Amino acid sequence: MQRRSVLRAGVLATLGTRLIPGLANTPGEVEVGGVLRDVTMQGLLGPSRKLSSLRGKPLIINVWASWCGPCREEMGSLERLSRRFWDGELNVIGISTDDYRDRAETYLRRSGITFANFIDQKLVLENMLGANRLPLTVLVDAQGRVLAKYFGAKAWDSAESIAMIARHFRIKL
C-alpha cells in the first residue's frame, strides 16, 4: 500500500518535472546517455551480484512489482527473450520493487521465470533508473551506458521489439 502511494506521488512529480527540461524524475536518476553506478543487487531465488559484473554485454533491465498487472503481463515475453538469447548475446535481468521479498519470490516461482531477478527494497536502483512508474525497461550498453528507457508493458520477444533492441545495441539478433 505504501509503495502505491509513493508511485502515485511519483506520477504527480513526473508531471511537474516534464514541464521543466533537464530535470531528473527521481533522486539520483541516471538519464539516457549516462553510465550506471555500480551497486550490489540482492538476489531473488539466486545469488546477489554487482551490477558491474554484467558489463561486457548489452543488458536489458526490467523494473517490476508482483502487484503490477502490466509488469506481470510482459514478464513472459522477457522470459522468452532471455531464453532465446541465452548463449550470451545479451543479458536480461529483473529488479523487483516489492516491499516484501516473499511476494516477489512467490511470483517468480509460480510464473516460472528463470532469468536473474533482484530486489530493491532500499530504492537505490529504482531511483537510479528513474522508475517512477512501472513497468520500466532500460536498455544498457556493454559499458554500462543507458541507451533507452521504456515505460509500460511491451511484447519484448516480438519481431518489432527485437529489431528495436538490435538497433539500440547495434548488434544483429
Label each region the model flagged.
Residues 4-24:
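N-terminal export signals
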Residues 23-51:
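N-terminal "domain-start" segment that seeds a small globular fold
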Residues 37, 59, 134-136:
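Short loop/turn microsegments at loop-to-beta-strand junctions
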Residues 44, 54, 142:
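Short, ordered coil/turn segments that flank beta-strands lining enzyme active or ligand-binding pockets
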Residues 52-67:
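Short active-site neighborhood of thiol/selenol oxidoreductases, capturing the structured segment around
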Residues 72-111, 121-128:
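Structural microenvironment flanking redox-active thiols in thiol-disulfide oxidoreductases
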Residues 109-113, 121-164:
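Thiol/disulfide oxidoreductase modules built on the thioredoxin-like
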